Amino acid sequence: MAGGRCGPQLTALLAAWIAAVAATAGPEEAALPPEQSRVQPMTASNWTLVMEGEWMLKFYAPWCPSCQQTDSEWEAFAKNGEILQISVGKVDVIQEPGLSGRFFVTTLPAFFHAKDGIFRRYRGPGIFEDLQNYILEKKWQSVEPLTGWKSPASLTMSGMAGLFSISGKIWHLHNYFTVTLGIPAWCSYVFFVIATLVFGLFMGLVLVVISECFYVPLPRHLSERSEQNRRSEEAHRAEQLQDAEEEKDDSNEEENKDSLVDDEEEKEDLGDEDEAEEEEEEDNLAAGVDEERSEANDQGPPGEDGVTREEVEPEEAEEGISEQPCPADTEVVEDSLRQRKSQHADKGL
């Protein structure tokens, strides 16, 4: 009887002890923290850490399948970071659009190597072995670095980071309007258009105010002096222009006078030549008339061949009548000469 009663009691005690041990061990096991990741998240506030030492950065997005496939490889590579003497980081482009703009990330996933502020793009696969060989064999030395305006630390890329951060905020605001508040998409677009116009007008007003603040007006006496100087300069310029025009007019008048004198001299020369020609013509006509008259008067006696004077006289009279100039012809010649003289006189005037 005693042995039968002790058996159930021992069993109950053993069960209670096991339960107590399990109760005490459970919270300890639950309190153990999970394995900490060696990949350091990079943000806009701590990204300058990559300017010192050697780093490998990965740009990813939570919705990217290719990025999710390389997560385990990237974690394994980060665990060996102490052995490789390299730091490993990652950037979420959804949460940090400014950093994606600073590094000008256009494809995902994107990998970058940084060594003392010099950045290079890693274009190999995101596999642990390839990443490890890239560091151990120093394959990054054969890759052209991002220098000049392409460097993430340059002023150009800083401006690009600002633009990307603004675009990210606008995108989040658009999602808030359309998803959270349920506003139609076109209403959101109208809101952004109006906001852009208002912002532009406000910036223009600010620039005008700044220019007015930095613009120092001249004192009154200085402004009056400057106005007087300006007027005197304008008057001096007007006088110079007037003098130049007068000189030009004088030169034109002198040229016209010279041309008129030359024309008058030419006309006088032509008139003298015409008068000489007329005098020659008159002399020739007078000489012809004198010759004809002398021939008419100088008719000889009758010939030795026995021809009587009475027979010859009618013939010579007829020849003299035919050869003697007609008074009407001489009058016509004299009239033509007079007309020519009057024409030349008119030309001379």
Curated annotation (Swiss-Prot):
Keyword Zinc: no
Domain Thioredoxin span(s) in chain numbering: 30-137
Disulfide bonds: C64-C67
Keywords: Disulfide bond, Electron transport, Endoplasmic reticulum, Membrane, Nucleus, Phosphoprotein, Redox-active center, Signal, Transmembrane, Transmembrane helix, Transport
Record's keyword annotation contains Nucleus: yes
Sites of Phosphoserine modification: S251, S259
Topology relative to the membrane: Single-pass type I membrane protein
Positions with biased composition (Acidic residues): 242-284, 312-321
PROSITE patterns reported in the protein's UniProt record: THIOREDOXIN_1, THIOREDOXIN_2
Active site (record annotation): C64 (nucleophile), C67 (nucleophile)
Location(s), subcellular: Nucleus inner membrane; Endoplasmic reticulum membrane
Name of this chain's protein: Thioredoxin-related transmembrane protein 4
Lineage summary: Eukaryota, Metazoa, Chordata, Craniata, Vertebrata
Gene that produces this protein: TMX4
